[in-house]
Design a protein with these regions (language model features):
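Beta1-alpha1 glycine-rich phosphate/pyrophosphate-binding loop at the start
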Residues: 44-117, 206-232, 239, 305, ...
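A Rossmann-like FAD-binding core segment of flavoenzymes
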Residues: 46, 114-145, 150-153, 213-314, ...
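Residue-level detector of alpha-helix initiation sites
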Residues: 56-57, 80, 162-164, 203-204, ...
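FAD-site-proximal beta/loop scaffold in flavoenzymes
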Residues: 163, 168, 174-190, 288-335, ...
């Protein structure tokens, strides 16, 4: 993969002008970010006070604060710039947008703001890193991109996010944003008075089902076994709730949608005990089989918990390695919201600034 650098629209003399990108964004006209490739043979070494890894709300916010602190940050965008919000349609719970905003549009505006204040945004994927024993007054942290580029940084913010686990069934990817979701907190509002299904049997599924009762008229929990894995107290709440029913020993073979544009209208189920098939009419489906943090490249470099989430100090973003900070869903196994991710991105940048200031004295 060639390295790619994100550019703002080009001014008449050929110079990149991030201010024009932001001005256009603020006017409500969100431009595409032009991506140009660099030949594989032209690898580079980038040196910075702060390297931000990840281009979601946490990463962009960290970059904005770092740039305003004159840390001249470099942001490595990763495989999916914009993160999970790039597959989210209406975002109605992010402050500042009275009528809501499209997920991709929100991320375009964040990218524009980060570029405007001086962040260098590079489209690359970190594939190797050396964090232990580096940073601070010693050798800089060394990271390598898929492009072959080397990144040397005095401090690092890891904001690579997490991904919802999916079933991989027909209709699931196709109808995301049209009735298929993995976040009840994000999308439950759209199903007021409707019937929705939740797929899963652990804490995540039960919590999603309970949350959805605040909006939906009927919530159907679908589980492939005859008992739940969720904590007993959550199960008690689930079974006692009049809006919730459970379909046991069932798997979803297909998510069905109709209309133009298509919206989810039902699920094709299969009873794994009897082998019988059933069509279940629903207005939406929430896949709740857990999340997986994007931390594979940092394994054995920073401390992680049993699910792979990066461990940070209570109430902060410091990791087990001084000078390395973590923000957003990569260290948040509870909230997983755009606004909380942005908040921890701010915290990480402020903590990195203080860390670097301490190194200079």
């Amino acid at each position: 993969m060639a390295r790619r650098i994100w550019h703002a629209p080009v001014a008449e003399k050929g110079a990149a002008d991030p201010a024009r990108l932001v001005s256009s964004a603020l006017d409500g006209h969100i431009p595409c970010i032009v991506i140009t490739s660099t030949p594989e043979s032209m690898t580079q070494t980038h040196t910075t006070d702060l390297l931000v890894i990840g281009a979601g709300p946490a990463g962009y916010t960290a970059a904005i604060y770092a740039a305003r602190a004159n840390l001249k940050p470099i942001l490595v965008a990763g495989l999916q710039p914009g993160g999970q919000l790039m597959i989210t349609t209406d975002v109605e719970n992010y402050p500042g947008f009275a009528r809501g905003i499209q997920g991709p549009e929100l991320m375009e505006q964040m990218a524009a703001q980060a570029a405007h204040v001086g962040t260098q945004i590079i489209h690359d994927i970190i594939t190797e890193c050396t964090l232990k024993g580096h940073g601070g007054a010693g050798e800089p942290f060394r990271l390598v991109g898929d492009s072959g580029d080397v990144y040397l940084a005095r401090s690092v913010v890891i904001a690579t996010g997490a991904q919802a686990k999916w079933l991989g069934i027909p209709g699931e990817a196709q109808y995301q944003g049209s009735g298929v979701s993995a976040c009840a907190t994000c999308d439950g509002f759209f199903y007021r008075g409707r019937t929705v299904a939740v797929i899963g049997g652990g804490n995540t599924a039960v919590e999603e089902a309970l949350y959805l009762t605040h909006h939906a008229e009927h919530v159907i929990l679908i589980h492939r076994r005859d008992s739940l894995r969720a904590e007993k107290i959550l199960q008690d709440r689930l079974f006692a709730h009049p809006k919730i029913t459970v379909k046991w020993n069932c798997v979803v073979d297909e998510i069905v949608a109709t209309g133009t544009p298509p919206v989810v209208t039902g699920l094709n189920l299969r009873d794994i005990s009897s082998g019988t098939n059933e069509h279940l009419a629903v207005d939406g489906v929430f896949v709740a089989i857990g999340h997986a943090p994007n931390t594979a490249v940092f394994k054995d470099q920073v401390e992680t918990d049993d699910e792979g989430y990066i461990v940070t100090n209570p109430g902060g973003t410091r990791t087990s390695v001084p000078g390395v900070f973590a923000a957003g869903d990569v260290q948040d196994r509870i909230y997983r919201q755009a606004v909380t991710a942005a908040g921890t991105g701010c915290m990480a940048a402020l903590e990195a600034e203080r860390y670097l200031a301490g190194m200079s004295h």
